[in-house]
Regions:
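Hydrophobic/aromatic-rich structural module bridging two neighboring secondary-structure elements via a short loop
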Residues: 79, 84-95
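Terminal, membrane-proximal amphipathic helices
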Residues: 1-79, 101-259
């Protein structure tokens, strides 16, 4: 999938920034240790906050994360203080880097609050599944149809438990592809199944144009709120909800393929 590989180059540059990587265990302990007894911390780390805490608490912490990241994005330079080699490797315009760095940081935090596993299992490199999860986070934040349903049903531990009871409804990669493709279009990349012009130079000006066209730091708050709203549906996620999400994904994939 040449289109996805090209867009991933942008993603891979941004995720190299130290500010982007959220250590799940440290984040969860920092945010929830005051709400729990010490003996509950292992359960928090193993099963996630949704196994121990009310939706009210989860939503409150999530909203605080949205507020904090919006403020950071407005006043912190993610490129300041970077080692020379890493700074030189970032070829994306600074304003684009800034926006996506804090968007991805916020998205990870919201994901961990509502039950997602550690995206950085290999510590240094993101797996393909982890990269797809980040793309879906951004897709939800940008309002791409089908991404919220796919994010919920496509692999989170809660959904995996539900899937065991209805294996015939399991998602296939053929359903993932059209929706991921649509997310990439939202990034401003002109996608074709035949491939794309090679090189980052074709991507960066488009991303810069999207940003200057209104994708500013001020939009991060509603984008974060959109992701929080959809992820919060994972609290008490049921078989009925899973089936509804799968049907939404199937319909959206058919619509996209018919375009």
């Amino acid at each position: 999938m040449a289109e996805q590989e090209l867009a991933m180059q942008v993603l891979q540059q941004v995720v190299k920034l130290p500010v982007v990587k959220v250590e799940r265990s440290k984040f969860l302990v920092d945010k929830f240790s005051k709400e729990l007894d010490p003996q509950d911390i292992p359960t928090l780390l193993e099963q996630g906050p949704t196994s121990l805490l009310s939706q009210e608490i989860l939503d409150r912490v999530a909203n605080a994360c949205i507020r904090d990241n919006v403020l950071l994005a407005s006043g912190t330079s993610v490129l300041a203080g970077l080692p020379g080699g890493l700074a030189m490797a970032i070829t994306i315009p600074a304003d684009v880097t800034q926006f996506y760095a804090f968007s991805l940081k916020l998205a990870q935090e919201l994901g961990y609050i509502y039950g997602y596993e550690d995206l950085w299992a290999s510590r240094e490199e993101l797996s393909e599944d982890a990269q797809n999860t980040l793309l879906l986070y951004l897709g939800v934040m940008l309002g791409v149809n089908g991404t919220a349903a796919l994010l919920r049903a496509g692999g989170i531990t809660i959904a995996k438990q539900v899937m065991k009871t209805i294996p015939n409804k399991a998602l296939t990669k053929t359903l993932w592809y059209p929706i991921l493709k649509k997310v990439l279009k939202i990034f401003g990349v002109n996608l074709t199944k035949g491939g794309l012009a090679k090189g980052m130079g074709k991507v960066i000006p488009i991303l810069g144009g999207v940003l200057s066209g209104g994708l500013t730091f001020a939009t991060m708050k509603p984008m974060g709120e959109s992701l929080q709203k959809e992820l919060s549906k994972l609290v008490n996620y049921s078989e009925v909800q899973y089936q509804e999400d799968v049907e939404t994904i199937r319909k959206e994939a058919e619509i996209i393929e018919g375009e």
